[in-house]
């Protein structure tokens, strides 16, 4: 197994809605592969069996709202529209949003994650939209 890296954000001062956080990600250029949205379906019992469907952003956000209301883990795959990088966003609430940096993870020497790229392209971007990032935690497992 290769390296794994994740970034955990607390955006609860901005909103309690995970759908609002996903919308903020969309505003800073993190979106989807064409019309296809990859997400954890409703009542998936934490099986992590992502579904890839041609649904609208509105339909996806409705599903996220339903999952959050049911206390389920919400998950969506987002891609940086200016590169080939992608993340898995996972959250039950906006106090702990985990971003698995696993799709074409940006690296520096020795294969370490270029965390400054992710801070610049995610945390700083979110703050520019008014989404306050109250805390940020980074983990890398070798």
Regions found by a protein language model. Give the residues of each.
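Structured domain cores in non-transmembrane regions
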Residues: 33-68
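Charged interaction segments
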Residues: 54-142
């Amino acid at each position: 197994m290769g390296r794994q890296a994740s970034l955990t954000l607390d955006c609860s001062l901005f909103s309690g809605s995970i759908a609002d956080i996903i919308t903020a990600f969309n505003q800073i250029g993190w979106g989807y592969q064409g019309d296809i949205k990859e997400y954890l379906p409703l009542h998936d019992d934490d099986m992590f069996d992502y579904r890839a469907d041609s649904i609208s952003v509105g339909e996806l956000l409705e599903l996220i709202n339903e999952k959050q209301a049911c206390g389920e883990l919400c998950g969506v795959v987002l891609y940086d529209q200016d590169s080939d990088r992608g993340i898995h966003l996972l959250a039950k609430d906006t106090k702990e949003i985990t971003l698995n940096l696993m799709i074409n993870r940006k690296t520096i020497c020795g294969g370490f994650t270029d965390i400054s790229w992710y801070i610049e392209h995610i945390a700083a971007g979110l703050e520019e939209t008014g989404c306050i990032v109250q805390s940020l935690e980074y983990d890398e497992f070798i």
